[in-house]
């Protein structure tokens, strides 16, 4: 319910994954430099806009992503992982852990 999947690249979701409401998964991002992001005017008056960059998101098996979590481009979430509600996942998460926060970080092992 109310999830957003921006799939300009691959989003691979493993078996038995549970994705709670309002989760956002992004595969696209823009340059941080303003000129690169907004484009450069050409001699003819037209604009050359930036190209969106993308990176895949991989979600392992037996993963639970809590409500309102945001998964950023290029992230891999391992198997048997719990991502806490409201987390912002900016880096890979290894197998068999519970992770949460902004930014998301491993808190403990998931046995």
Q: What is the predicted function of each stretch?
A:
Residues 1-75, 102-103, 110-111:
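Flexible, glycine/small-residue-enriched loop-and-beta-strand segment within the central core
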Residues 70-104:
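C-terminal/domain-terminus segments
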């Amino acid at each position: 319910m109310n999830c957003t999947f921006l799939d300009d690249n691959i989003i691979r979701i493993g078996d038995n994954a549970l994705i709670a409401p309002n989760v956002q998964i992004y595969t696209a991002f823009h340059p941080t430099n303003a000129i690169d992001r907004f484009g450069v005017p050409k001699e003819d008056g037209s604009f050359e806009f930036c190209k969106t960059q993308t990176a895949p998101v991989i979600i392992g098996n037996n993963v639970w992503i809590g409500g309102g979590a945001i998964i950023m481009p290029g992230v891999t979430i391992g198997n048997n992982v719990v991502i806490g509600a409201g987390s912002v996942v900016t880096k890979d998460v290894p197998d068999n852990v519970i992770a949460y926060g902004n930014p998301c970080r491993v808190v403990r092992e998931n046995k």
